[in-house]
């Protein structure tokens, strides 16, 4: 005599299959042999059990997916895996332009302060470009020139934090997701009563650090903001209670001001109102944050490169990181010959050289790199 299989099948995760398996299992039990499993009450209970099982199975599957860089779909998961490979994601990038500024004055020297704002107009919308460092120049006879000044589109922002070592959850965040980390300056003031300030540099090679190294580290958080953090006193210098951390950076509109070519000066610079501005190179380089797909591609390649450029893939990865607005890049060694644009063919080998061909997402004269 045939007997019913009383085991519950657990291989299916689809809702309908889960419900069918539950129904088959319960029908095989003596306690439920006279039950109507199509009745409204029992049917609702089976639906509830099936939905719960389906959700648990789905969540378990998604959890497993997020454990690996290749299959992760959440940005926070991808960024976390990239960090374990020593890869820093690329933030939003501000368009930048180069200008010459001349101040009509007989003063011996003048200083253009960081945050000095210039304006431009694109399609009826005004955009602000700012300097990110103090620059001092001397008089040449009739004017004080500031040559090849780099200006970045956006608002120059300062975020300040007072260090509290008893707060284990304290974080030093760039407070806007549109922050351009390439413009970041990190300073640490001793205390509110001691205004002595030290400028920290970004750590690039921990093997060169000591317990006194004044460096900072940067990472993208799960909220999409960037966080600055510091050493523990063994690997680079640790912060002390009462220190004031000052983060200065540009918050940008990303790609909107690419191509800006004409800039208006502020009303005055260091007390001088006679200002002439000449554009050296148009605004370019504005880009959105690095995409999930780009992180998945570049993080393993960057890890393989180990901070040096030797292979073709090493150069490709570094180029994309150095110029986020790169749409496509081709790299070849000098042993393969240089490319002659006039003839469209490769010439004789040039040993000891690497050639890089870049297609940009915006206007840019790459030969000026």
Model-inferred region functions:
Residues 1-369:
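Signature of Asx- and small-polar-rich beta-strand/turn repeats characteristic
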